[in-house]
Design a protein with these regions (language model features):
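An alpha-beta-alpha
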Residues: 209-266
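Periplasmic-binding protein-like
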Residues: 162-174, 194-196, 234-237, 285-298, ...
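Segments of small-molecule ligand-sensing domains
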Residues: 355-425, 436
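Bacterial signal peptide processing site
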Residues: 70-73
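Beta-alpha junction/loop-to-helix N-cap segments that form part of ligand/metal-binding clefts
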Residues: 123-124, 135, 139-201
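N-terminal secretory signal peptides
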Residues: 1-68
């Protein structure tokens, strides 16, 4: 059985990392000639119970474990050999671009254009969907792709068209306002959505977010810091949507672990120095400083930290996994939570080989959503809440994930340390979730 360069996420976190995992999921891709196969085993367990701006998206995906062997699909409660769906022709004509020839129709809503011009992000996500169809999902689903024109009205119109053509599940859109509009159409039709927004406020029962959410990053880094003996914190955050959500999540995460937050210093553009002085005044009372800032602003923030003499342990989120941050002298030794990059690197290699271009970071979201739809489509209760919120979750190269009943998700992230201008894993991503 040949092994391929993609592998799933790292070993389970130890109890010292403050997390315990069980109910191991198993999703595998394999190669047989030009065809990729998937095996998804959801181990026996009880069924489980802001897009901040169009420029500040946190992408992520699950580019999956590979193994060269024949495979099938096993789901809890599935009847082996049960017919997946009536013939596609029973639903009438498809809409938009159509990929695959499976009996189950799935709609995909992407921002293929914006202000009348082609969208590179949308094009990359569409290409990734094609990869998924060709590698696995095309035999179980027919994928209908519509352009929402990066607008709420376009998203609603796309949803109506795809549902009218027999779609049982909608994938996308990307931007929060567009998700809200499309979700209202899907909810009225009683069909679920798996959307790509990073705005957790658009999630709801039946509208699931596949993206990496700020809550996931914050929970992971706080839990890790506490497990390493950090008992009190300070926060230095920008006055923007990302900062607002991150600060709120940090308070919740720290509160659950009885870790006091001594000060929260907010700052506007170019005003990091004043916030750093606030933190510096209490630096002797805190063990770590959390800074949820984007990579392009971190050089000025780092300079403010240096001038204020702040040397406490720095904590961040996945937006720090950027060369502009990794090379900053003041950030050496900092910790941040992020998906392991091995999965995206392997996906990128294959994407480049096929399309001769670099994928957008969000491309793995559409790729994984299509593959997940293809796997679930082979079972009688394919897109039910029970199937989508299975407590065991799904396992991929970027880490395990599962959908919560409220539409948000839980993902397994690694913790990185910045050392010698590079990010090194100091706490591997978990391979599985605790049951419950």
């Amino acid at each position: 059985m040949p092994q391929f360069p993609w592998t799933a996420s790292g070993p389970p976190l130890s109890p010292s990392d403050g997390e315990q995992y069980a109910a191991k999921p198993d999703i595998k891709f394999g190669s047989e000639g030009r065809r990729w196969e998937i095996e998804m085993r959801l181990m026996s367990a009880s069924p489980g119970g802001r897009d901040l701006s169009r420029r500040s998206l946190i992408g992520g995906g699950l580019a999956l474990t590979l193994a060269g062997c024949n495979s099938g699909i096993e789901m809890p409660g599935a009847e082996v050999g049960a017919p997946a769906a009536p013939p596609a022709a029973a639903f009438g004509p498809t809409v938009g671009e159509t990929l695959g020839s499976g009996p189950v129709r799935v709609g995909m809503i992407l921002p293929l254009s914006q202000n009348g011009a082609p969208s590179p992000v949308g094009a990359s996500m569409r290409n990734a969907a094609q990869m998924a169809i060709e590698e696995f999902a095309g035999s179980s689903v027919t994928l209908m792709i519509q352009d929402d024109r990066s607008s709420p009205d376009g998203a609603a119109q796309s949803a109506q068209a795809e549902l009218g053509a027999g779609a049982e599940l909608l994938l996308g859109p990307v931007y929060a306002p567009d998700v809200r509009q499309a979700a209202s159409v899907a909810k009225a039709a009683g069909k679920p959505m798996i959307a790509f927004s990073t705005d957790a406020t658009v999630a709801q029962p039946g509208v699931y977010l596949l993206s990496f959410l700020i809550q996931t990053y914050v929970d992971r880094i706080v839990q890790f810091a506490v497990s390493r003996g950090k008992k009190s914190f300070a926060v230095m955050a920008p006055q923007n949507d990302y900062g607002n959500v991150a600060v709120a999540e940090f308070h919740e995460s720290a509160g659950r672990l009885n870790a006091p937050v001594a000060v929260v210093a907010r700052y506007g553009p170019g005003e990091a120095q004043g916030a750093a002085q606030q933190v510096g005044a209490v630096s002797g009372q805190v063990d770590a400083l959390f800074i949820p800032e984007q990579a392009d602003a971190m050089p000025s923030v780092a300079a403010a930290l240096a001038s204020s003499g702040i040397k406490t342990q720095l904590l961040g989120t996945g937006v720090w996994n950027d060369a502009r941050v990794l090379r900053l002298p003041q950030l050496q030794g900092a910790w941040f939570s992020a998906p392991d990059s091995a999965g995206f690197n392997a996906f990128s290699q294959r994407y480049r080989a096929k399309f001769s271009s670099e994928p957008a970071r969000l491309a793995t979201l559409s790729y994984d959503a299509v593959n997940l739809a293809g796997a679930l489509a082979r079972n009688p209760d394919r897109f039910s809440q029970r199937a989508l919120t299975n407590v065991s979750g799904f396992n991929g190269v970027d880490g395990v994930f599962r959908f919560r009943a409220d539409g948000t998700n839980e993902r397994g992230l690694a913790v990185m340390e910045i050392d010698n201008n590079a990010a090194t894993v100091i706490s591997p991503a978990p391979r599985s979730f605790a049951a419950g």
